[in-house]
């Protein structure tokens, strides 16, 4: 779930005829159902910015979580990918995807709504947040895989790169505007109440998804045992050298990213002294990295091939990870310069992640037949995010034992090694399609 079309929307006053000409020239945007699906993605990305800030802020500032507890929270959020990733692929290949997406979104909305309720009842605890994080992760496992497969159904394989670029533009807009909005809401209302805004977004999104008219054909009933289907998904990925390479590279990236996720709020608040408001502002500026990447991803894929674009993303994100532990507490003796440095770091990490994942998703779906597409997506998600709980727990342990900055330093070293391994140890640069 990641474009100039967002810019078009903001300048409608220049003439509806001009916009209609642009839309008519865009085969993806001519599809009303894609536009509805994209709108729900916009709501999801903006709402996610609130939760990404508010949930860890609840843990760090309200419940005084330790680095180990933050690592455990991040691990619980990613654990469902390991537990449910493979079975979800069987479910997707046996079910229509849109109802699965809607059920997953409803489950996440209920979990999020429990946070302000528990806070109001004075029952909010770290274990409660563990449970909420686990439910949110479970919803994302099934719903996220279903969204990728349903998008392929809506636009076809030929429209995937263009559609993914538009989703990247959505994320870029959310990453530029959303964090500032989220930081302001958390600062003004408190983290639990701010989460309610995301719940409202889920409700609107569900109502919008009900308006999608395209109906997937019901997959033929399967007489095989679910375990056999899981084995077929694993075998398909394993027997495709390209998918196998993508799986281990993405698994290593997720291990590092979830380690960073476990520690970055602690680092920003307790080491750098940032408030939720300044964190939101820094992340808002850093979100320009996603915007830059969404504009670069198609030219890079044309020039370097899809695999080359993936490698560029690895290197750019590694550069961002390497900068994190180098941020001083008071750069040039000023907290303002420290916030600016933090924003620059987020810029590079987000830019690299987008440059990596847009061609990564498009490439793996191009080489997969429809019959196993759901199992492939779920298998890849399960394999690649399986390392995430380990990364979060390791980072939390390193932060607890040696300090948050030292833990982030280990993540930086791992990111540099991964980028070098991707460039010199794989044949991704040869993947042109």
Regions found by a protein language model. Name each.
Residues 2-433:
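Alpha-helical transmembrane-bundle signature of multi-pass membrane transport and export proteins
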């Amino acid at each position: 779930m990641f474009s100039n079309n967002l810019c078009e929307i903001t300048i409608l006053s220049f003439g509806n005829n001009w916009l209609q000409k642009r839309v008519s020239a865009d085969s993806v945007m001519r599809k009303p159902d894609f536009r509805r699906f994209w709108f729900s993605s916009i709501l999801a990305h903006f709402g996610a910015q609130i939760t990404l800030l508010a949930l860890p802020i609840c843990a760090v500032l309200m419940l005084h979580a330790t680095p180990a507890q933050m690592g455990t929270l991040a691990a619980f959020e990613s654990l469902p990918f390991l537990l449910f990733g493979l079975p979800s692929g069987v479910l997707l290949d046996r079910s229509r995807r849109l109802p699965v997406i809607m059920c997953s979104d409803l489950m996440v909305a209920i979990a999020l709504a429990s946070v302000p309720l528990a806070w109001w009842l004075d029952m909010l605890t770290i274990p409660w947040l563990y449970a909420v994080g686990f439910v949110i992760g479970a919803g994302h496992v099934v719903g996220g895989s279903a969204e990728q497969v349903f998008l392929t159904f809506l636009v076809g394989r030929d429209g995937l790169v263009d559609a993914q670029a538009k989703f990247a533009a959505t994320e870029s807009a959310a990453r530029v505007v959303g964090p500032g909005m989220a930081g302001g809401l958390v600062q003004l209302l408190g983290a639990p109440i701010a989460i309610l805004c995301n719940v409202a977004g889920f409700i609107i999104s569900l109502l919008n998804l009900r308006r999608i008219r395209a109906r997937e054909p019901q997959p033929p009933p399967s007489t095989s045992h679910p375990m056999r289907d899981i084995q077929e998904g694993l075998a398909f990925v394993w027997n495709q050298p390209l998918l196998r390479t993508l799986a281990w590279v993405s698994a290593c990236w997720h291990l590092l990213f979830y380690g960073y996720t476990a520690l970055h709020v602690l680092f920003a608040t307790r080491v750098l002294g940032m408030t939720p408001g300044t964190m939101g502002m820094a992340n808002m500026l850093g979100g320009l990295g996603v915007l830059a990447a969404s504009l670069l991803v198609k030219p890079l894929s044309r020039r370097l091939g899809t695999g080359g674009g993936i490698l560029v993303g690895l290197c750019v994100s590694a550069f961002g990870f390497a900068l994190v532990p180098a941020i001083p507490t008071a750069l040039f003796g000023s907290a303002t310069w420290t916030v600016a440095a933090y924003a620059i770091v987020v810029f590079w990490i987000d830019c690299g992640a987008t440059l990596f994942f847009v061609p990564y998703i498009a490439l793996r779906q191009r080489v997969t037949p429809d019959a196993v597409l759901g199992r492939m997506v779920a298998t890849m998600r399960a394999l690649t995010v399986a390392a995430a709980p380990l990364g979060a727990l390791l980072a939390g342990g390193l932060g607890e034992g040696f300090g948050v900055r030292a833990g982030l330093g280990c993540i930086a070293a791992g990111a540099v090694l991964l980028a070098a391994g991707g460039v010199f140890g794989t044949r991704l640069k040869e993947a042109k399609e």
